[in-house]
Amino acid sequence: MTTSIELSSYRDQHYKGSRFEQERSLRDSSTLYVGNLSFYTAEEQIHELFSRCGDVRMIVMGLDKYKKTPCGFCFVEYYKRSEAEAAMRFVNGTRLDDRLIRVDWDAGFIEGRQYGRGKTGGQVRDEYRTDYDAARGGYGKLLTQKIAPNPDNR
């Protein structure tokens, strides 16, 4: 089955299976990865936006693996591939909570993938950020650790 919405070059490095199986899963999937969300965006807001393209089966919010708080991404699964294609076409690059969101194909949600993969528990991209982004927790986590005073040195 070919799709009118092309696959991006991004591939989940933790995918369990061959590259061929991953490509097939992406081409058949009705699950989307949604990135660049504000840490304060609620699941209800995501549902409201994505349900304009079809019946949403499930939304899984991305969580900091240590704090269990939202960390700026989610997975949206539709019942039909055609509904997910509509979301790729019409929602990708739109604004939600005053942020341009990224929508990409996902091979399908697997338990455990809802947790950030960064050293500090969130997303890797938020660890190395040097700019201040209030909607994503302020400065990058590793930068914050470097400039924060060590209470043991007082």
UniProtKB/Swiss-Prot annotation:
What are the GO MF terms of this UniProt record?
RNA cap binding
Q: Which GO terms describe its biological process?
A: mRNA cis splicing, via spliceosome; regulatory ncRNA-mediated gene silencing
Cell compartment(s), UniProt: Nucleus
On assembly, the entry states: Component of the nuclear cap-binding complex (CBC), a heterodimer composed of Cbp80 and Cbp20 that interacts with m7GpppG-capped RNA. Interacts with Ars2.
Q: What is its main location?
A: nucleus
The record's listing under InterPro entries reads:
NCBP2, NCBP2_RRM, Nucleotide-bd_a/b_plait_sf, RBD_domain_sf, RRM_dom
Family according to the record: Belongs to the RRM NCBP2 family.
Where does the chain cross the membrane?
Answer: none
Report the protein name in the record.
Nuclear cap-binding protein subunit 2-A
Indicate yes or no for the key word Lyase: no
Q: For the RRM domain, which residue ranges apply? A: 30-108
Source organism per entry reads Drosophila virilis
